[in-house]
Amino acid sequence: MSENYVAPGQQRYLRACMVCSIVMTYARFRDEGCPNCEDFLHLQGSPDQIDSCTSQVFEGIITIANPQKSWVAKWQRLDGYVKGVYATKVSGQLPDDVRTTLEDDGIQYIPRDGSATEAD
């Protein structure tokens, strides 16, 4: 997990994806995109999209080494995502056009800010 290491002076550049809640630096989102959501968010190389779909305001950090076997990953709805560092709560709202794209692609968006719960 050394690829997720953030130097002490770099924490202020951390952002969390509003869809999957992975936490990375702004530069990593810019250079690599979101490892879970890039197919539909298109963050790589797009500062406007990064600003719209990630947030600097998040709470709690958990590290998931094996998302398929972790009960914490299941509890946080992270099973199926890549291993990494995730926020437990991400503040902010996705733009309407991004939400529409998710719906059109058949992806159920559940806000990570605690404002909605998963429908059973």
UniProtKB/Swiss-Prot annotation:
Alphabetical list of CDD domains matching this protein: Spt4 (cd07973)
Pfam families attached to this UniProt entry: Spt4 (PF06093)
Tagged with keyword Oxidoreductase: no
Cystines in this chain: none
Biological process terms in GO annotation: mRNA processing; regulation of DNA-templated transcription; transcription elongation by RNA polymerase II; transcription elongation-coupled chromatin remodeling
A molecular function GO annotation: RNA polymerase II complex binding
Domain of life assignment: Eukaryota
UniProt-annotated location(s): Nucleus; Chromosome, Centromere
Keywords: Centromere, Chromosome, Metal-binding, mRNA processing, Nucleus, Transcription, Zinc, Zinc-finger
Location, primary (coarse class): nucleus
Signal peptide: none
InterPro entries recorded: RPABC4/Spt4, Spt4, Spt4/RpoE2_Znf, Spt4_sf
SMART domains named in the record: Spt4
ZnF region ranges: C4-type: 17-37
One Gene Ontology CC term in the entry: DSIF complex
Function: The spt4-spt5 complex mediates both activation and inhibition of transcription elongation, and plays a role in pre-mRNA processing. This complex seems to be important for the stability of the RNA polymerase II elongation machinery on the chromatin template but not for the inherent ability of this machinery to translocate down the gene.
UniProt subunit comment: Component of the spt4-spt5 complex. Interacts with RNA polymerase II.
Family (UniProt): Belongs to the SPT4 family.
Stated name of the protein: Transcription elongation factor spt4
Biological source species: Neurospora crassa (strain ATCC 24698 / 74-OR23-1A / CBS 708.71 / DSM 1257 / FGSC 987)
